[in-house]
Amino acid sequence: MVRFEKVHLVLGLALVLTLVGAPTKAQGPVCGAGLPDKFSRLNFPEGFIWGTATAAFQVEGAVNEGCRGPSMWDTFTKKFPHRCENHNADVAVDFYHRYKEDIQLMKDLNTDAFRLSIAWPRIFPHGRMSKGISKVGVQFYHDLIDELLKNNIIPLVTVFHWDTPQDLEDEYGGFLSGRIVQDFTEYANFTFHEYGHKVKHWITFNEPWVFSRAGYDNGKKAPGRCSPYIPGYGQHCQDGRSGYEAYQVSHNLLLSHAYAVDAFRNCKQCAGGKIGIAHSPAWFEPQDLEHVGGSIERVLDFILGWHLAPTTYGDYPQSMKDRVGHRLPKFTEAEKKLLKGSTDYVGMNYYTSVFAKEISPDPKSPSWTTDSLVDWDSKSVDGYKIGSKPFNGKLDVYSKGLRYLLKYIKDNYGDPEVIIAENGYGEDLGEKHNDVNFGTQDHNRKYYIQRHLLSMHDAICKDKVNVTGYFVWSLMDNFEWQDGYKARFGLYYIDFQNNLTRHQKVSGKWYSEFLKPQFPTSKLREEL
């Protein structure tokens, strides 16, 4: 373990091709000693991509327009409204109708890129091509991508951000079945051929660890499957088998990724493009320094290596094979060959870090947690917190964890290109939720972004990690899964009481200043 204390469509497309064709390692960071007095994009490598991120289900709305079919999250929010704060994404923040307005917000932020996802059931309403293609849905993403390029904003497209078509859930259980591999590959291949001449940055899957564990092991997210013995959620799950299903889901997901990437690399329109997976690890510190053992390496295998090791080396980490045993599916030799080297870069979503607490095995109640032999805690055995957590914050702020993870990936996974595909600060404003003036004064979010950019800068300059892009989560407040609309992550405040009006927050103003092509007038030393 390593320890460390802008104007026409043609022009827009040319910009994309120029950046894709550039050297993998961004060039020329300004690596001075100590905390820079003035801090901006000029302190980072030339060609570094700066952006914001969203996901289709969380922002689009318009669930009954353009022949869009239902996803498993539509079903989950309607079937279990109490598990999503009695909210749903039928309207969300209406990005489907307001994307042109929202692209102007991106321009106001001075960003280079925008991460979006394609809603599978908006393209294939029933999950597969033979059951019908929505021409309206296909055209929507053409229009969105064209509008981005017209405004010199690079699209980074996620093929799957958790919205499995409900028809495939009903037919065979979605990712629980190996049948999903063929259907996902068909869908992904369609998007590559449809948009590949315009889009040169792709992600197959967003946060596979969260998708599998939270959906099929602890039941926190859709489809909400778990065993009755899971603390906190077992009483809510109507079906499931913890300790088994999540591993099968991820196995099918990884094979879906491998076959989709094979299709991508044989797609002529996609030539010059790059593709990866967006992982979502936390960093772990030992809760008790006197009893560390192998807990940190093991839990990082379970949270990151579970999906990164197969796409890098062709198989699961040995620690997972040892701990999970027969419950962990096996790859064939042909599948290992297809998986190995199946990403051009590593996407990483980073939010927080935790203390790793050693626990005993529990063979009678298997789960991801008991298999990893690690539970999580925000405090050490001596009562020290992992990081600061403002009263309304959703997660502890520990920016060093970002640097540690980047260095860990470099040292253990072949020094890949890395894109920070999400990094953001969530807050629950409570009784002030609808107070626009209060909600836009998000100084804690500004501080969070500043600290994490400095940590990323250290990883690039001091650890020589090949980071080439950074995306804030999120452009604007949106539907945050089981938290509904209570958790706000945006650089823009959404006024849910007043026609979903967008208001730039303090963090958005700072980010726009940071991204100007010249050094800002503000001094970072004074702000921190």
Curated annotation (Swiss-Prot):
Changing E207Q: Loss of activity towards ABA-GE. It is an enzyme of class 3 (hydrolase). A motif (Prevents secretion from ER) lies at residues 525-528. GO terms for molecular function: abscisic acid glucose ester beta-glucosidase activity; beta-glucosidase activity; identical protein binding. Polymerization into higher molecular weight forms displays diurnal fluctuation, similar to the ABA level. Hydrolyzes abscisic acid glucose ester (ABA-GE) which represents the predominant form of conjugated ABA (biologically inactive). No activity with beta-D-glucopyranosyl zeatin. The hydrolysis of ABA-GE in the endoplasmic reticulum (ER) forms free ABA and contributes to increase its cellular levels under dehydration conditions. ABA-GE hydrolyzing activity is enhanced by dehydration stress-induced polymerization into higher molecular weight forms. The ABA produced by BGLU18 contributes to the initiation of intracellular signaling as well as the increase in the extracellular ABA level. Optimum pH is 6.0. The active site is at E207 (proton donor), E422 (nucleophile). InterPro entries: Glyco_hydro_1 (IPR001360), Glyco_hydro_1_N_CS (IPR033132), Glycoside_hydrolase_SF (IPR017853). Belongs to the glycosyl hydrolase 1 family. Seeds and hydathodes of rosette and cauline leaves. This is Beta-D-glucopyranosyl abscisate beta-glucosidase. Its EC number is 3.2.1.175. Disulfide bonds join C226-C237. The keyword Disulfide bond applies. The keyword Hydrolase applies. PANTHER family: BETA-D-GLUCOPYRANOSYL ABSCISATE BETA-GLUCOSIDASE, GLYCOSYL HYDROLASE. Residues 1-26 form the signal peptide. Pfam families: Glyco_hydro_1. Keywords: Abscisic acid signaling pathway, Disulfide bond, Endoplasmic reticulum, Glycoprotein, Glycosidase, Hydrolase, Signal.
